[in-house]
């Protein structure tokens, strides 16, 4: 029963998207068009009249067509890519950034590495991490970061500064990207995103990291000067550029369902094709992708 309820919730969310409704209608029309054509051809070969038999066939096939269209119209939620000219394995998926084990996860922060109000939003990735691993001692993460920085008190760090902390079964790279901003907690510029990404790839090489799991760098900060799609393109371009200069680790880009249209992966796939990537594995959206921890 729980699986059925999860599936119903998933389709309720999907039907709220105009892109999914349009895709579903196109798939249904294609299915019934092909069905009618094949049925008419079969009846013509058999020498039978089409009206009654054809109508009966359509009645029988309608439930099959609806089920087929509902499944076939599901957007892709997990795509793995391979590049023929660079060692740069890539995976882009819709899911929960924290839902993994033995991974190196990147979390972007402001240049003071703040972990609490007023400089950190209540639904930020940093706050989510604290709720998962430091809920009884919320100041412990802040103390661990300052210790790694060899600081007794806060001080602004350069863009791209990285602090590595282990928590639970994963390691976390806290990446300094944004500046403090009085009205919106943190703000970020495109050049800061590019610089921090360059530092991230260098860090991965120097520390022999095999794979990084990242959100869309820069998208979680207020007053970002561009939208989510350009930031994804920036992330992909930076990663492949670095890999062409020198081999770099594998990359997993995790998109939260609440952050983007579910057709976003189709756009990402198209841009990856332009960059020379080939999709080697694709998985459709399932109820597990939408039953995530709230942000």
Where are these predicted regions, by residue range?
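Macrodomain-like recognition of ADP-ribose-binding/processing modules
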Residues: 2-295
């Amino acid at each position: 029963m729980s699986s059925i309820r999860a599936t119903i919730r998933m389709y309720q969310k999907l039907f709220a998207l105009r892109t999914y409704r349009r895709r579903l209608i196109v798939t249904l029309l294609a299915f019934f068009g092909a069905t009618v054509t094949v049925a008419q051809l079969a009846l013509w070969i058999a020498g039978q009249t089409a009206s009654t038999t054809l109508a009966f066939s359509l009645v029988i096939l309608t439930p099959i067509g609806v089920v087929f269209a509902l499944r076939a119209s599901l957007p892709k939620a997990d795509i793995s890519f391979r590049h023929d000219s660079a060692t740069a394995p890539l995976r882009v998926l819709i899911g929960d950034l924290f839902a993994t084990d033995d991974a190196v996860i990147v979390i972007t922060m402001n240049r003071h590495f703040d972990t609490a109000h007023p400089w950190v939003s209540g639904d930020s990735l940093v706050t989510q991490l604290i709720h998962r691993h430091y809920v009884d001692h919320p100041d412990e993460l802040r103390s661990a970061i300052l210790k790694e920085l060899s600081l007794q008190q806060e001080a602004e760090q350069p863009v791209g500064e990285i602090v590595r902390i282990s928590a639970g079964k994963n390691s976390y790279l806290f990446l300094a990207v944004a500046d403090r901003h009085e009205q919106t907690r943190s703000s970020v510029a495109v050049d800061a995103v590019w610089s921090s990404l360059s530092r991230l790839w260098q860090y991965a090489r120097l520390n022999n990291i095999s794979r990084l799991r990242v959100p869309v760098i820069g998208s979680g900060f207020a007053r970002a000067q561009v939208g989510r799609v350009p930031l994804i393109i920036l992330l992909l371009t930076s990663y492949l550029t670095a890999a062409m200069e020198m081999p770099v680790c594998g990359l997993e880009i995790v998109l939260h369902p609440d952050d983007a249209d579910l057709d976003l992966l189709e756009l990402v796939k198209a841009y990856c094709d332009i960059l020379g990537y080939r999709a080697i594995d694709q998985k459709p959206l399932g109820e597990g992708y939408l039953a995530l921890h709230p942000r």
